[in-house]
């Protein structure tokens, strides 16, 4: 399976929104309630905010052939904001390839620590990459509370 990583462009926005929704509602369903999933990924993204942050951040899109199979973005301060892989392409090395690219970019920018807020589902992936849990936290999305973890990795 040949994974191609490329830069984000605004034309990707609809595909990323759909991938985000489907991934959250399937992959994360093992760890979160339907109410939490609906609050996290309600079916439509804030297109203006997403496009702005995906453009401002270092964003990588993973493709296999013509299909977008994942994406991730990193802010200038080392905050890994989003990392999502298509539900049909889990455990294929896509998240690893995306994280490798994001972390290498951070290193080249002089960032010493990458931080993320990882879901219950994603925590083991990040732990295998050397991230450590700083704290568990309860976050509110659309009036619904859910657990995630502030995690960091020293580069």
Regions found by a protein language model. Name each.
Residues 101, 128-129:
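Alpha-helical structural signal in soluble globular domains
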Residues 117-123, 129, 136-155:
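C-terminal "cap" of GNAT-fold acetyltransferases
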Residues 7-10, 18-90, 99-101, 105, ...:
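Acetyl-CoA-dependent GNAT
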Residues 93-95:
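Conserved G/P- and acidic residue-centered "switch" motifs that form tight phosphate/ATP-binding loops
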Residues 84, 107, 124, 143-144:
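Short secondary-structure boundary/hinge segments and terminal tails
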Residues 15:
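Charged catalytic carboxylate motif
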Residues 2-4:
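Extreme N-terminal starter segment of soluble prokaryotic enzymes
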Residues 106-119:
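Conserved GNAT acetyl-CoA-binding A-motif
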